[in-house]
From Swiss-Prot:
It catalyses: guanosine(46) in tRNA + S-adenosyl-L-methionine = N(7)-methylguanosine(46) in tRNA + S-adenosyl-L-homocysteine. The active site is at D118. One of its GO terms (molecular function) is tRNA (guanine(46)-N7)-methyltransferase activity. This is tRNA (guanine-N(7)-)-methyltransferase. Pathway: tRNA modification; N(7)-methylguanine-tRNA biosynthesis. GO terms for cellular component: tRNA methyltransferase complex. CDD domains: AdoMet_MTases (cd02440).
Length: 217
């Protein structure tokens, strides 16, 4: 998500150090201490303006959530929502998603969300896609055994690429939606991102998948 630079965003994050973790590497292997409990931890890589992560946290107080984004202004808008909702189970990190293993110990995370990631459509940018094999290796490292990735996008090309990438990596595709918003059974539990709300209003198809890592043979 690209947004204009927000005046005072840096100061805002610094003033809310109880939510935005200034030095996340300090908590590697100790995130339960940061949250003050041993609840499962889910992370969203590329959290945008925070509608999804705060919505999930409100619905599931029994789960801890970490919102991750590398854009200062974007994360400040997500912080707005977290402050307004007063959610004790949300933390935030201003870091690059490619470096997750620097901040989380092996097996420390239970689930990864990838929502409306940049599709990087040009072939020379394939390695930047968040479902490229090097990213999958990082997720596998920080996730518990058989940990899961939940992925949503409006981009058919990225979705098809991701299906192949995950399958080639040896992941099990548990569920696949080719038109998520037509699934009335799933609708009550679907928390939408800002992009998803906008695309849904325009009638665009939303794709979704759930996949898990399998034990190495």
């Amino acid at each position: 998500m690209r947004v204009r630079n927000r005046k005072g965003a840096g100061e805002m994050l610094a003033e809310n150090a109880h939510i935005v973790v200034e030095n996340p590497a300090d908590f590697k292997g100790r995130w339960s201490e940061r949250f003050g409990n041993d609840h499962p931890i889910h992370i969203e890589v590329g959290c945008g303006k925070g509608a999804f992560i705060t919505g999930m946290a409100a619905l599931h107080p029994e789960i801890n959530y970490i919102a991750i984004d590398m854009q200062l202004s974007v994360l400040s808008y997500a912080l707005d929502k977290a402050i307004e909702a007063d959610l004790p189970n949300v933390q935030m990190m201003l870091v690059d998603g490619a470096a997750l293993s620097e901040y989380f110990a092996d097996g420390e995370i239970d689930q990864v969300y990838l929502n409306f990631s940049d599709p990087w459509p040009k072939g020379r940018h394939e390695k930047r896609r968040l479902t490229y094999k090097s990213f999958l290796a990082t997720y596998e490292k920080i996730l518990r055994p058989e940990g899961e990735i939940h992925f949503k996008t409006d981009n058919r090309g990225l979705f098809e690429y991701s299906l192949v990438s995950l399958a080639n990596y040896g992941m099990e595709l548990k569920k696949v939606w080719l038109d998520l918003h037509q699934d009335e059974e799933f609708a009550p539990q679907n928390v939408m991102t800002e992009y998803e709300q906008k695309f849904s209003q325009k009638g665009q198809v939303i794709y979704r998948l759930e996949a898990k890592f399998l034990p190495k043979k």
